[in-house]
Amino acid sequence: MASAQLIDQLKNVEATFQELTVRLADPDVATDPAELQRIAKARSSLEATVQAFHDWQKLNRDLQQTEELLRESASDPELEAMARAELEQLRARQEQLEEKLTLLLLPRDPNDDKNIMLEIRAGTGGEEAALWAADLARMYTRYAEKLGWSVRLASLSEGELGGYKEAILEIQGDQVYSKLKFEAGVHRVQRVPVTEAQGRVHTSTATVAVMPEVDEVEVVIDPKDIEIKTARSGGAGGQNVNKVETAVDLLHKPTGIRVFCTEERSQLQNRQRAMQILRAKLYEMKLQEQQASISSARRMQVGTGSRSEKIRTYNYKDNRVTDHRLNQNFPLQPILDGELDDLIQACIGLYQKELLAELS
C-alpha cells in the first residue's frame, strides 16, 4: 500500500498540473510565446505522473468493490473464487502502479530535456580507432533518425583512412539528453581491422562525451580568455573552399580546450558554432566536477558519465555487445544499426533502481 508521504506528493503534483492547465488557458499567457512554451513544457513533464495517479485511484476503487463482493459471496463458492482471483490480479496491478509512481517522482535531471553535442574521439588503436569512431557516429546518427531527432555534423577531424579522429554531432529533439547521457564513456571494439593482413583480432577504443547544449546565460565566457585563429576551410563553401579563411580554430586559454570548426559556410558561422561547442564543453566539465563529488559519497554503476569509464565492448567475432554496467549482452548488428532502445532503457532502469535504493 502506498505511503501517506507518497500520496501527499502525488496530490501536490496533481494540484500543480491543474494550476498549469488553467494558466495555459490564460489569454495573457497566449500572447507570450516564450511563457506559453515554458508552461506547456512544465505541464507535459507532469502528465504521465498525473495519469498514473488517476489510474491508481481508480484501481483502489475497484479493489474496494471487489473486497466488498468477496465478503458478500461467502455463501456462493463459485462467485467467491472469481472474486478472489480478481482481487489477486488487482493487488498485483496495484503493486506495479505504486512502483511506477515512485519512479515517476524521482528527482529529474534538469538537463534531461536539452539537446546535446555528442563528441566521439578515437582512442587507442591508431587508424582503426578512427574507423571505429566513425562507426559509432553512424550508430548514433541512425538511432537519432529512428526517433525523429535532427542530427548535423558540428565539427570533424578526419583520419587518413576515412575514419574520424574527432567528430562532434549536434542532436536535437525530444528529451535527447535523458536518453543519450548514459552513452558517455569508453567504447571498446574487438575485431579484425581492415589494415590487418594476418587476420588477427585487435582491440581499439573510442571515447564518447555527451554535452547538454547551454546558452550564454548558463555559461559566461570572458572574451579575454579566447584566442581565435582562422584558416582556409576544406568543408562546405562552394567556390570559396581553400580561397577564403572560413575555418575557425578557437582556444580557451584557462582550460586549454581547443575547438576547430570548418563545417559552416562562413567564418562568422564557424565562430558561432565553435563558441556553442566551447560552452557545451565547459558545462560538461562543471557537471563532471559535480558528479565526482557525488560519486565520492556513493558509487553508482550508471550515470557517472565519466570519459574514462569503460562502459561497453563490441565483439565482432562473437557478434555481441557487452554493457559492463548492466553485465548484459546484446546482439551486435542491431546495435550498430542504431537499435539502442532496449540497451538505453536497461541503463535508465538500473539508474532509477540505484537512485531509489540511495533515497530509501
UniProtKB/Swiss-Prot annotation:
SMART domains: PCRF
Keyword vocabulary terms for this entry: Cytoplasm, Methylation, Protein biosynthesis
Classification via Gene3D superfamilies: 3.30.160.20, 3.30.70.1660, 6.10.140.1950
Record-linked InterPro entries: PCRF (IPR005139), Pep_chain_release_fac_I (IPR000352), Pep_chain_release_fac_I_sf (IPR045853), Prokaryotic/Mito_RF (IPR050057), RF-1 (IPR004373)
Principal place of residence: cytoplasm
An example molecular function term from Gene Ontology annotations: translation release factor activity, codon specific
PTM comment text: Methylated by PrmC. Methylation increases the termination efficiency of RF1.
PROSITE patterns linked to this entry: RF_PROK_I
Superkingdom of this protein's organism: Bacteria
Cross-referenced SUPFAM superfamilies: Release factor (SSF75620)
Location in the cell: Cytoplasm
Modified residues (N5-methylglutamine): Q239
GO CC annotations, alphabetized: cytoplasm
Function statement: Peptide chain release factor 1 directs the termination of translation in response to the peptide chain termination codons UAG and UAA.
Family as reported in the entry's similarity comment: Belongs to the prokaryotic/mitochondrial release factor family.
Annotated protein name in UniProt: Peptide chain release factor 1
Native source species: Synechococcus sp. (strain JA-2-3B'a(2-13))
